[in-house]
Design a protein with these regions (language model features):
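Conserved active-site-proximal phosphate/metal-binding subdomains
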Residues: 13, 21-67, 73-211
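Short amphipathic alpha-helices and their capping/turn segments at secondary-structure boundaries
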Residues: 1-16
Length: 211
């Protein structure tokens, strides 16, 4: 990506987010890779990316921070990412279970009642695998196509007549509270979340000795 942008536009990145296989939502890995996550040398990939971006930092005389994402749960994970040479981390799932998150209470409750056993990899209508909570909706779309009554034009090449379901409607329904009849994306460590807290307390827990 850096090479392409440098060649075509003489521009480089402001920062790089490296998302690993434990992330929630759509994943940049194949189903086969995700079935053998332990075999993915994610640490090695991070180190290679950090080494690669140095060339472009020198060429453009700017710092390009590397942010690690996907499955970052606690201070131990943050410290590990920083030890690899990353400049920071990106965390999503843990902030869903906060009072400040604008998702419905039912959506947050689905997170804190999740277990490792009911988190699975699904095939999204966009053609990528994704990680989500198993619910009635997931069970239904495994059995049959759900008719699409309205197109939100969110994907250029989406055909409402052919897709198994409308992912936009499924995501909106879930976040608004219909968690059994919508799509609840989540990270691999969501089963470790057991309470709804505040952003302030969560930041204190995550930063702690790192400050």
């Amino acid at each position: 990506i850096l090479k392409m942008w440098a060649h075509r536009y003489d521009r480089t990145a402001d920062f790089i987010v490296v998302e690993g296989p434990k992330a929630g939502g759509h994943l940049g890995f194949s189903n086969e890779q995700l079935a053998h996550m332990d075999a993915i040398n994610f640490d090695g990939e991070i180190r290679q990316i950090i080494d690669c971006k140095k060339e472009y930092e020198q060429r453009y005389q700017k710092n390009i921070p590397v942010i690690v994402a996907g499955g970052i749960f606690d201070q131990k994970d943050i410290s590990h990412a920083l030890d690899l040479g990353a400049d920071g981390v990106q965390i999503a799932s843990r902030f869903v279970a906060t009072e400040e998150c604008d998702a419905s209470e039912a959506y947050k409750e689905a997170y804190i009642h999740a277990s490792e056993e009911n988190i699975e990899i699904i095939q999204s209508p966009v053609g990528m695998p994704g990680r989500a909570l198993r619910n009635k909706f997931i069970d239904r779309v495994k059995r049959a196509k759900l008719p699409v009554s309205k197109c939100y034009n969110c994907l250029e090449k989406c055909s409402p007549q052919k897709v198994p379901y409308c992912i936009t409607k499924a995501l909106i329904d879930a976040v608004r509270g219909d968690v059994e009849n919508g799509l609840v994306f989540c990270g691999a460590n969501t089963g470790r979340i057991h309470e709804i807290t505040t952003v302030h307390h969560l930041m204190q827990e995550l930063a702690g000795d790192l400050q």
